[in-house]
């Protein structure tokens, strides 16, 4: 019989291998030669596991390797290596000669970055795979034999379980193996199937197909190598040497077949007899085993009873210990309580004495309190009078403050809510160097009058609220504007803006320089000073925002990215206007305000033209929000101050701008014109005020109308070169103020008239373009009027609701008056109750005195009772001591019982060991007798076979006998292997086929030499007989399964395994299969 060879490179467990095996090919334990004994141990189990691992491979030369590819495993015979789904960059950089993954049909690519355990020197191979039902076609190969290696790794279902991915691998449309990677090596571990032999025909094609059984197949790499040439062993022929002439006599095939048939029949008879004996011995062993199990069960029962008794004894010990501890704790508590009560009695005596002293003191204090009650009533009355005076003063102060605000704002209104101040700058260095003439007359500046020489000594005069000469400084200018600041703190909206042509000093007036501050800085400074003066009565919260209107677009100058979002004007529910998303900086002092102003001025849009190199091309607007809360009455106000530095207003012809600058100038002039229209409509109290004609006026809507106050600085130039712009600025200011003084009539200059006509024509052209925009605005106005009508309807409905609410308020007011009358009556009744309570207080004082006397008597009685309790507790302690003595006697008795039980347990253990030793000796003797009988029978069978069936060998020499027996035994062993041995591996099958092929070749050669024709096929009737004679297999192993018969075998016989059992170390249960009526030993 051939020995089973197991590869050491496949250390897999039995559970993982059995899941990979096909249900048609179950696994069995291995059986060695007939003369070898089978023993139970770790080595036999490991051999079985390895054999089951290799049973999944059809090719006996192939093997499974649970580690990755290494440099030492590389060979020069590699023809092609394909990394399935691999990255081209890793493929080119690797040491392997890896081909591109272009030979597949179907499937998907999957890659992972997880580390692969034991991946060898090329771990990237197992980090990519092809998944799905697919195939590979390797073409352009030379005919011959090749070796294919498959690289697998489970990188998808890393948490299992076993059997979640099972698939078949077909090579040249023949099933090679059935895989479950996770059950063999687990997740993120490589598994290699190497040395799979494949034959390439003339078409030069190898087709590898992957087909899923459960889940999708997965492969990481395919390696194709040249197959080494296998040397064919020489076949030996069967001959017999003669004793006399030493010639080799060939045995004919027919005679050899007859000899084998006879030996086969005799061996079958002997095997039947041995199988009967074997069944008889197994029955005896089964009975012995049943008796052993019953003895073990009795022993277990005794042990259980013994354990219960030991547990009861231990529980009794624990209860006794716990009770003893309880007694000790009770005695300790008694001693502690005794000490505690002694100390408590002493403390009570001390407290009684202290209470007596306190009682005397309280009685004295009670007399003093009774005497001091009239004085307390007088003091309460005085305090109430002071509180009422304080409340009257607060009310008068709030009324006086409101009147002061009204008077102050009335004075400001008498001066005009819309006030216009005119300021003229001095001549600059360029104008003085060219000796430019001054056209402004400041003779009536104190009265607010101003004269402008227009030409031909004609003079045009204007009147404003205040006129500043070039000699007036920033302090003089702010002195007239400072009253407006107080109005902001009183809750009014104020707007201060500077208007004029480019280069007239608007920015200087509003912002100034660090050495000479402007209106903006001085206004905020005064806001903080007044707020600091009023901090005891009013709290203020001031926030600042800086923005600009550039080309009719609002830009936030404090935002980090001004152009990132578009800002729009929204109207809130209370009617005020605000810009959502605008940055508001909360400021606490003037330094923070200056930093905010500097940041806004640096971000402002500036451009150059013919008039000024640094002309402001946008309207810079500083918004100051003031929130005030009156700490006296809780009134809250919210006001807004706008400080606006308007862009330069100049004529387009003079600036000579084009492109983007022309668009900027047109937008500036349009917004300034809209501002003039709004202010003029406010001054004339027009029914419609066009706030929405420009973003500038729309922003200033809250600070231009209603109770708001407006101050305008008109900036002019004294130079004769700027006379037209100066007149246009003064006309605009006069239009704003609503007062225009007629000019002194003198001789008219015709040249000037012609210039004016040309300007009129240009104005007409501009007006045409404006008319178109006006039409669009009218359409928008009509739409707004439709919306206003809807709002009017809603307003009417709200008015009706207000009337209903007023009626409800009247009814509630009447009810409150009635409740007030009821409350007055209740107050009178409460006064009467207070007088009654005073009388009750006196009565309670008398009762207190009586209670003190009774309590002192009761305390004395309690002290006596406590002394009696102490005496009783001393008596109870004696009783507890007697109980402790009784418990100690019981403990001694229980200890004696426990010693008796221990002695009985020892006796039982000695008896149990004696019985076990006797039974083990009997079983060993029986097993040895069975082994001796089997050996004798085997020797007897061999002697009978040699003497009866081969008489011609008796006269041969020893060498001839050896050769003859070798040849005959070779055939007999083949027959026995075909009939008696269970195959457990595909390797044994292939080796069996090789031996059969060699026999057939020898027969053919002998037939060709002798010229005789023989029928080498087996008789089908014999096969049927052999199958009928064979009994069902009886296998004594860990797992019992049916097996697939080998291709060359006709029947199978059972094989018994002998095992040595150590009863002292382990207990083996007995299992009976009642349906098949077989008795089987299983571990």
From Swiss-Prot:
UniProt biased composition (Basic and acidic residues): 1020-1032, 1062-1083
Keyword terms of this UniProt record: ATP-binding, Coiled coil, Microtubule, Motor protein, Nucleotide-binding
Pfam families, A to Z: Kinesin (PF00225), Malectin (PF11721)
Compositionally biased intervals (Polar residues): 971-985, 1044-1054
Cited InterPro entries: Kinesin-like_fam, Kinesin_motor_CS, Kinesin_motor_dom, Kinesin_motor_dom_sf, Malectin_dom, P-loop_NTPase
Residues reported in the UniProt entry to bind ATP: 500-507
Name used for this protein in its record: Kinesin-like protein KIN-14R
């Amino acid at each position: 019989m051939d020995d089973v060879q197991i590869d050491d490179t496949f250390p897999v467990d039995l559970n993982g291998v059995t899941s990979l095996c096909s249900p048609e090919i179950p696994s069995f334990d291995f059986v060695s030669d007939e003369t070898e004994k089978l023993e139970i141990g770790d080595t036999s189990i490991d051999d079985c596991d390895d054999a089951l691992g290799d049973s999944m491979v059809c090719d006996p030369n192939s093997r499974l390797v649970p580690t990755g590819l290494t440099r030492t495993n590389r060979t020069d015979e590699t023809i092609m290596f394909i990394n399935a789904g691999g990255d081209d960059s890793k493929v080119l950089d690797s040491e392997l000669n890896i081909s591109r993954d272009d030979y597949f049909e179907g499937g998907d690519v999957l890659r992972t970055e997880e580390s692969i355990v034991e991946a060898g020197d090329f771990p990237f191979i197992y980090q990519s795979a092809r998944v799905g039902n697919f195939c590979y076609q390797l073409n352009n190969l030379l005919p011959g034999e090749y070796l294919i290696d498959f690289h697998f790794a489970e990188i998808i279902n890393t948490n299992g379980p076993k059997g979640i991915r099972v698939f078949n691998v077909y090579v040249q449309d023949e099933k090679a193996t059935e895989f479950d990677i996770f059950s063999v090596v687990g997740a993120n571990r490589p598994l290699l199937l190497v040395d799979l032999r494949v034959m390439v025909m003339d078409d030069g094609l190898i087709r590898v197909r992957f087909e899923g059984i459960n889940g999708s197949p997965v492969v990481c790499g395919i390696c194709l190598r040249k197959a080494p040439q296998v040397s064919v062993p020489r076949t030996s022929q069967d001959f017999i040497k003669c004793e006399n002439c030493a010639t080799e006599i060939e045995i004919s095939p027919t005679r050899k077949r007859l000899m084998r048939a006879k030996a086969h029949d005799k061996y079958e008879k002997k095997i039947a007899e041995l199988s009967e004996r074997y069944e008889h011995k197994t029955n005896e062993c089964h009975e012995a085993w049943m008796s052993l199990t019953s003895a073990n069960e009795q022993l277990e029962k005794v042990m259980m009873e013994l354990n219960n008794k030991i547990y009861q004894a231990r529980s009794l010990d624990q209860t006794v210990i716990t009770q003893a501890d309880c007694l000790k704790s009770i005695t300790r508590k008694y001693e502690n309580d005794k000490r505690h009560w002694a100390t408590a009695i002493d403390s009570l005596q001390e407290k009684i004495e202290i209470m007596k002293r306190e009682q005397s003191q309280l009685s004295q204090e009670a007399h003093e309190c009774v005497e001091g009650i009239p004085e307390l009533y007088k003091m309460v009355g005085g305090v109430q009078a002071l509180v009422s005076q304080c409340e009257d003063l607060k009310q008068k102060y709030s009324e006086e403050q409101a009147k002061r605000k009204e008077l102050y704002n009335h004075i400001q209104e008498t001066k005009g809510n819309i006030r216009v101040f005119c300021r003229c700058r001095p001549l600059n260095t360029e104008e003085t160097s060219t000796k430019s003439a001054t056209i402004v007359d400041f003779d009536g500046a104190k009265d607010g009058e101003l004269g402008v020489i227009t030409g031909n000594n004609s003079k045009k005069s204007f009147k404003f609220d205040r006129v500043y000469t070039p000699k007036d400084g920033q302090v003089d200018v702010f002195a007239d504007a400072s009253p407006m600041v107080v109005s902001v703190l009183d809750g009014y909206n104020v707007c201060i803006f500077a208007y004029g042509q480019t280069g007239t000093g608007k920015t200087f007036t509003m912002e100034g320089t660090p050495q000479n501050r402007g209106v903006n800085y001085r206004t905020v400074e005064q806001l903080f000073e007044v707020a600091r003066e009023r901090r005891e009565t009013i709290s203020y919260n001031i926030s600042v925002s800086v923005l600009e209107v550039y080309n009719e677009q609002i830009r936030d100058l404090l935002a980090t990215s001004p152009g990132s979002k578009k800002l729009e004007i929204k109207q809130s529910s209370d009617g005020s206007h605000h810009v959502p998303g605008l940055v508001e900086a909360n400021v606490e002092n003037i330094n923070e305000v200056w930093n905010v102003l500097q940041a806004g001025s640096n971000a402002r849009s500036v451009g150059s033209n013919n008039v000024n190199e640094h002309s402001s091309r946008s309207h810079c607007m500083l918004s100051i929000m003031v929130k005030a809360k009156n700490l006296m009455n809780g009134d809250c106000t919210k006001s807004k101050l706008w400080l606006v530095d308007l862009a330069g207003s100049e004529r387009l012809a003079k600036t000579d701008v084009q492109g983007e600058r022309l668009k900027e100038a047109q937008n500036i002039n349009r917004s300034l014109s809209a501002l003039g229209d709004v202010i003029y409509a406010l001054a004339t109290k027009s029914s419609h005020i066009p706030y929405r004609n420009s973003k500038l006026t729309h922003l200033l809507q809250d600070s231009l109308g209603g109770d708001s106050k407006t101050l305008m600085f008109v900036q002019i130039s004294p130079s004769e070169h700027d006379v037209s712009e100066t007149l246009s600025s003064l006309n605009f200011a006069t239009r704003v103020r609503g007062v225009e003084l007629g000019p002194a009539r003198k001789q008219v200059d015709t040249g000037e008239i012609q210039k004016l006509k040309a300007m009129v024509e240009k104005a007409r052209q501009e007006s045409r373009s404006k008319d178109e925009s006006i039409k669009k605005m009218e359409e928008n106005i009509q739409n707004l009027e439709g919306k206003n009508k809807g709002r009017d309807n809603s307003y009417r409905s709200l008015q009706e609701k207000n009337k209903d609410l007023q009626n409800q308020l009247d009814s509630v007011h009447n009810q409150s008056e009635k409740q007030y009358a009821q409350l007055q009556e209740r107050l009178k009744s409460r006064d009467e109750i207070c007088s009654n309570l005073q009388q009750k207080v006196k009565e309670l004082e008398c009762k207190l005195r009586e209670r003190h006397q009774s309590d002192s008597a009761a305390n004395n009685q309690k002290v006596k009772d406590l002394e009696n309790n102490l005496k009783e507790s001393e008596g109870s302690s004696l009783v507890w001591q007697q109980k402790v003595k009784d418990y100690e006697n019981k403990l001694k008795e229980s200890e004696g019982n426990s010693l008796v039980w221990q002695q009985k347990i020892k006796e039982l253990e000695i008896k149990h060991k004696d019985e076990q030793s006797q039974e083990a000796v009997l079983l060993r003797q029986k097993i040895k007798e069975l082994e001796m009988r089997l050996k004798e029978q085997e020797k007897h069978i061999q002697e009978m076979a040699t003497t009866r069936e081969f008489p011609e060998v008796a006269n041969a020499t020893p060498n001839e006998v050896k050769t003859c027996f070798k040849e005959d035994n070779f055939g007999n062993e083949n027959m026995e292997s075909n009939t008696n041995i269970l195959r457990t591996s595909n390797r044994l099958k292939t080796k069996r086929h090789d031996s059969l092929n060699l026999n057939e070749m020898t027969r053919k050669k002998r037939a060709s030499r002798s010229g005789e024709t023989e029928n080498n096929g087996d008789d089908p009737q014999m096969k049927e007989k052999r199958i009928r004679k064979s009994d069902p297999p009886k296998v004594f192993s860990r797992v019992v399964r049916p097996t697939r018969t080998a291709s060359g075998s006709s029947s199978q016989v059972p094989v018994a395994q002998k095992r040595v059992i150590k009863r002292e170390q382990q207990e083996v249960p007995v299992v009976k299969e009642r349906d098949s009526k077989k008795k089987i030993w299983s571990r």
